[in-house]
Amino acid sequence: MGKGMKIPLRYQISEYDCGPTALLNGVSYLFPRAEVPPEIIRSVTLYSLDCYGMDGAAGKAGTSRMAMMYLANWLEGFSRAANFPLSCQYISGQAVHVGAHSYVNDAVARGGAAVVRLFYEVEHYALITGASADRIYLFDPYYLAEAEPEFVRAGIEVTCAHPHAYNRIVPFDCFNRETRELYAFGPAETREAVLLFDERTRRTADDTIEYFI
């Protein structure tokens, strides 16, 4: 039944579940389907979507920073206790940027991935899986079949050709802005990311040609 198979990354099924979808996509990106413990799926679903909308409806403001930090710590603790080779690190503030001396760039260069909070009309979560000299490879769980005009203006490519890894190719310049524009990380004090690794395949600095791009 293809137990060693990695599955395509998933899209959110509502306007609100980008957080749990991006986090579970990080796990799917790193691990084959047969290796993923059901407890991870259960707990990510249980502890996300904790924010209430303006009308008082549960989940309608998505997933909070507190919940994402809790889940990163829970995943790290669970993985140690269960001897599962996932490691997680939560970073925030000035530590979240792309480019030189970036924890995010370092993570993907070492074979990991990063769930990041950014802006796409509202605050949003997506998964960074790769980087080149001036582009970030991103899987945005919000489905688009083709680029909208604002993506074209920003130089962002939309692709469905790499379902296991990315569906957007985004210039570095988009991320480090402190504004609420498309894919900006926004003000430094509100930034956050979760770095994820499969410890069996995590590369060292000596193995990584593009270490700290």
Each predicted region: which residue ranges?
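Short, exposed beta-strand "edge-strand" segments with a Pro/Gly-rich flavor and a Y/T-containing core
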Residues: E15, R33-A34, A57-M66, Q94-A95, ...
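Active-site-adjacent substructure of cysteine-protease-like catalytic cores
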Residues: Q89-Y143, A147
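N-terminal entry module detector
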Residues: M1-G2, G112
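Noncatalytic regulatory segments and standalone regulatory/sensor domains
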Residues: V108-A109, A131-I213
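Cysteine-nucleophile protease catalytic domains, especially the papain-like/related folds used
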Residues: G2-G93, I209
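Compositionally biased, intrinsically disordered low-complexity regions
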Residues: G4-K6, D55, A95, S132, ...
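Hydrophobic transmembrane alpha-helix bundles
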Residues: L71-L86, V116-A131, R153-H164
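Intrinsically disordered, low-complexity boundary segments flanking structured domains
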Residues: L71-G77, A100-V104, R180-L182
